[in-house]
Curated annotation (Swiss-Prot):
The keyword Ribonucleoprotein does not apply. Residues 40-542 are annotated as: Ligand binding A region. GO terms for biological process: cell adhesion. Residues 1-39 form the signal peptide. Belongs to the serine-aspartate repeat-containing protein (SDr) family. This is Clumping factor A. Residues 47-65, 106-132, 143-162, 566-598, 864-882 have a biased composition (Low complexity). It is found in: Secreted, Cell wall. It comes from the Bacteria.
């Protein structure tokens, strides 16, 4: 029993020993881990503490720290990334310089801590112990600098509004939430996004109800705190103060005012004495730069006095030992001053007052912030309101949809202004974006001063991406794919320290308007610097860019269009045209047209055509025609002719004709022609003609003709003719006759004739005739003729004729003819004609033609047409046929082929029918003569 107890006791003792070792080891590791965690969580504790001094120093730490890419939530990872950030500072000379500059810009009490952190980063590896040491010193400084709370709060304004880094495009909101859990210490990186506690600090710093504190004043006062001296402001003499500016100042167009001061220094002034220049609260001396500087007063290459800016924005100058050894010292100062957007938030008149002691100057100016840019329902404006050249950061504030219009699928993009050497870096690493919704557009300040606590932060509800190099995109939260309220976008970004360019940013707002048309509106921001002081404000100009392509989410509604294959058109045109053209064309055309035309034309044409034809003609015709015709023709022709003609004609004719014809003809002619034509014609004619003709003819013809004709004609004719003809004919006959005849005839004839003739005649005739005849004839004829003729003729005729005719004829004829003719004719004609025609034609033709024409015409046409078509419509403002009307004479002497219009060549048709009529007349004349000879 005792053995068992001992063994049990021994086992228990051993168990206790092992447990002690394990527990001790865990406690040791736990203590080490707690110290490490304490180092990384130290800033969180400071941020959440109730002490105002501690909160102030935390804010100052943010200002002094450089910016890195912390994205992690856990405290341990935060510490690790902090070390990495410090290591990168040591590796990157530019970033290292930034860290050192941040230390210089911090308050006097923070300088040793920041300097220590910088030394550690540069010279040795970063360890948790080093970080802890730095934070411990920071905690001690909190207790030592409780009196500096106001100054550090002022610096917080600069630090909270300094740019922070976002993580990646897809995780912006998550990163921003994470950033609120860890605020880096003084030697760590600045937070990626402003947390809730920092927002409170900003609200307190910029609250208009509290005394105004300026971010730039601390650095200047702390760095250049003057030694104890006497304020001799009221001892300065010969003080002169002026304000130079126009009557209107445009702050967003780099507008500013100049403050000028001049004075004499009393001989009693010594080193350390000071004087004060009061600056009105409506002005500041930094513009958009985060740190304001005032120019030192120089005496040659020696400094007479150095200036700093106090917390109220006034300037305090401290004399150097230069005044100890000088007398009758005078000085002049000129400083650029800028409209303060926090204290002047609206457009209006402002009275500016500045001075030295009791010597002041005042001036009332109009402050004009100008309206945002608007294009249709899109409105936007932006401004660059802060630049920190020490830390290479900037802040841009953009008003999106300040008009409060209805915009569908809104989006904002930001990028560099094209064709500029902008030094901005836009990417997920160097750009942080905050978005605020504005419920009432009246809450927007015209100066673009923004207090973030006054608006709803909707950054977590928007989609922020970086689709291209140096470009970001913000897609706004929408209700039914549209927005109706303004938004504020605050961009905190970085500047490339190696760039030689200036800041130049473009913001573009996209969206659909009420008509579902995709629109865009852009605004450009740049920075101007004055007097080398590093101060300035944005140069703003609205830009309406080239409208973008459709994004694809919403199809725009196409513009109304009506494409009716049937169209009605009415046109009234008056044109003068002169053309000289030569053409070689082959066309197959089928046309169906109905037209009513009224035209007056004067044409001058010279044509040379070869369809086996060579012609030279000059004609001058004046015609007025009104025609009404309906014809249905179907023709196929194959012709080969050889002709050499020289004609000059001048004709004046007036005709009124009404005809209806239905013809079907097929002809094949070859200088030997064999033609078969069937025609059914009905004509009624009433003609009155006076003719005086004188002709000399020498003809030799051989003809073999056989004709059968059955004709039926009704005619009423009245003619007066005076003819003089000389003819030389050889048909085995020689005749000379002079005749003067006056006849009145009324004839009614019915004839049915069938004739076959073969004739060969040579005739030489000389005749002169003067005839006056009145005839009224009515004839019905039915003729069938077959003729074979061979004729050689040489004729020269001059004719002057004027005729008025009204004819109506009905004819039914069938003829077969085989003719071979060679003709050489020279004719000159002068005709004046007037015609009234109304025609409707349906034609189907196949033609091969080679023509050359030269015509000059004046035409006035009035036409109404209705056509069924499916074609491209030429816009009303485009020139007819795609050419400019001013080029109507450019085609002169051109050898380009005429366009194929499908219309028949009326000149050629007239010439052909004229030749056929002449041939028929000749054959008829010869047959009658032969009949007379037989009798």
């Amino acid at each position: 029993m005792n053995m068992k107890k001992k063994e049990k006791h021994a086992i228990r003792k051993k168990s206790i020993g092992v447990a002690s070792v394990l527990v001790g080891t865990l406690i040791g590791f736990g203590l080490l881990s707690s110290k490490e965690a304490d180092a990384s969580e130290n800033s969180v504790t400071q941020s959440d503490s109730a002490s105002n001094e501690s909160k102030s120093n935390d804010s100052s730490s943010v200002s002094a720290a450089p910016k890195t890419d912390d994205t992690n939530v856990s405290d341990t990872k935060t510490s690790s990334n902090t070390n990495n950030g410090e290591t990168s500072v040591a590796q990157n000379p530019a970033q290292q310089e930034t860290t050192q500059s941040s230390s210089t810009n911090a308050t006097t009490e923070e300088t040793p801590v920041t300097g220590e952190a910088t030394t550690t980063t540069t010279n040795q590896a970063n360890t948790p112990a080093t970080t802890q040491s730095s934070n411990t010193n920071a905690e001690e400084l909190v207790n030592q600098t409780s009196n500096e709370t106001t100054s550090n709060d002022t610096n917080t304004v600069s630090s909270v509004n300094s740019p922070q880094n976002s993580t990646n495009a897809e995780n912006v909101s998550t990163t921003q939430d994470t950033s609120t859990e860890a605020t880096p210490s003084n030697n760590e990186s600045a937070p990626q996004n402003t947390d809730a506690s920092n927002k409170d600090v900003v609200s307190q710093a910029v609250n208009p109800s509290t005394p105004r504190m300026r971010a730039f004043s601390l650095a200047a006062v702390a760095a250049d705190a003057p030694a104890a001296g006497t304020d001799i402001t009221n001892q300065l003499t010969d003080v002169k103060v002026t304000i130079d500016s126009g009557t209107t100042v445009y702050p967003h167009q780099a507008g500013y005012v100049k403050l000028n001061y001049g004075f004499s220094v009393p001989n009693s002034a010594v080193k350390g004495d000071t004087f004060k220049i009061t600056v009105p609260k409506e002005l500041n001396l930094n513009g958009v730069t985060s740190t304001a500087k005032v120019p030192p007063i120089m005496a040659g290459d020696q400094v007479l006095a150095n200036g700093v800016i106090d917390s109220d924005g006034n300037v305090i100058y401290t004399f150097t030992d230069y005044v100890d050894n000088k007398e009758n010292v005078t000085a002049n100062i000129t400083m650029p001053a800028y409209i303060d957007p926090e204290n002047v938030t609206k457009t209006g008149n402002v009275t500016l007052t500045t001075g030295i002691g009791t010597n002041t100057a005042s001036k009332t100016v109009l402050i004009d912030y100008e309206k945002y840019g608007q294009f249709h329902n899109l409105s936007i404006k932006g401004t660059i309101d802060q630049i920190d050249k020490t830390n290479n950061t900037y802040r841009q504030t953009i008003y999106v949809n300040p008009s409060g219009d209805n915009v569908v699928l809104p989006a904002l993009t930001g990028n560099l202004i094209p064709n500029t050497k902008s030094n901005a870096l836009i990417d997920a690493k160097n750009t942080d974006i905050k978005v605020y919704r504005v419920d009432n557009a009246n809450d927007l300040s015209e100066s673009y001063y923004v207090n973030p606590s006054d608006f709803e932060d909707v950054t977590n509800q928007v989609r922020i991406s970086f689709p291209n190099a140096n470009q970001y995109k913000v897609e706004f939260p929408t209700d039914d794919d549209q927005i109706t309220t303004p938004y504020i976008v605050v961009v905190n970004g970085h500047i490339d320290p190696a760039s030689t360019g200036d800041l130049a940013l473009r913001s573009t707002f996209y969206g659909y308007d009420s008509n579902f048309i995709w629109r865009s509106m852009s605004w450009d921001n740049e920075v101007a610097f004055n007097n080398g002081s590093g101060s300035g404000d944005g140069i703003d100009k609205p830009v309406v860019p080239e409208q973008p392509d459709e994004p694809g989410e919403i199809e725009p509604i196409p513009e109304d269009s009506d494409s009716d294959p049937g169209s009605d058109s009415g046109s009234d045109s008056n044109s003068d045209s002169g053309s000289d053209s030569g053409s070689d064309s082959t066309s197959d055309s089928g046309s169906d047209s109905a037209s009513d035309s009224d035209s007056a034309s004067d044409s001058d044409s010279a044509s040379d055509s070869d369809s086996a034809s060579d012609s030279d003609s000059a004609s001058d015709s004046d015609s007025a025609s009104d025609s009404d015709s309906a014809s249905d023709s179907d023709s196929a022709s194959d012709s080969d002719s050889a002709s050499d003609s020289d004609s000059a004609s001048d004709s004046d004719s007036a005709s009124d004709s009404d005809s209806a014809s239905d013809s079907d003809s097929a002809s094949d002619s070859d200088s030997d022609s064999d033609s078969d034509s069937d025609s059914d014609s009905d004509s009624d004619s009433d003609s009155d003609s006076d003719s005086d003709s004188d002709s000399d003819s020498d003809s030799d013809s051989d003809s073999d003709s056989d004709s059968d004709s059955d004709s039926d004609s009704d005619s009423d004719s009245d003619s007066d003719s005076d003819s003089d003809s000389d003819s030389d004919s050889d048909s085995d006959s020689d005749s000379d006759s002079d005749s003067d005849s006056d006849s009145d005839s009324d004839s009614d004839s019915d004839s049915d004739s069938d004739s076959d003739s073969d004739s060969d005649s040579d005739s030489d005739s000389d005749s002169a005739s003067d005839s006056d005849s009145d005839s009224d004839s009515e004839s019905d004829s039915d003729s069938d003729s077959d003729s074979d003729s061979d004729s050689d003729s040489d004729s020269d005729s001059d004719s002057d004729s004027e005729s008025d005719s009204d004819s109506d004829s009905d004819s039914d004829s069938e003829s077969d003819s085989d003719s071979d003719s060679d003709s050489d004719s020279d004719s000159a004609s002068d005709s004046d004609s007037g015609s009234d025609s109304d025609s409707s034609s349906d034609s189907d033709s196949d033609s091969t033609s080679d023509t050359g024409s030269d015509n000059d015409s004046d035409s006035d046409s009035n036409s109404d047409s209705e056509s069924g078509s499916n074609n491209n419509v030429v816009p009303p403002n485009s020139p007819k046929n795609g050419t400019n009307a001013s080029n109507k004479n450019e085609a002169k002497d051109s050898k380009e082929p005429l366009p194929d219009t499908g219309s028949e060549d009326e000149a050629n048709t007239s010439l052909i029918w004229g030749l056929l009529a002449s041939l028929g007349s000749l054959l008829l004349f010869r047959r009658k003569k032969e009949n007379k000879d037989k009798k």
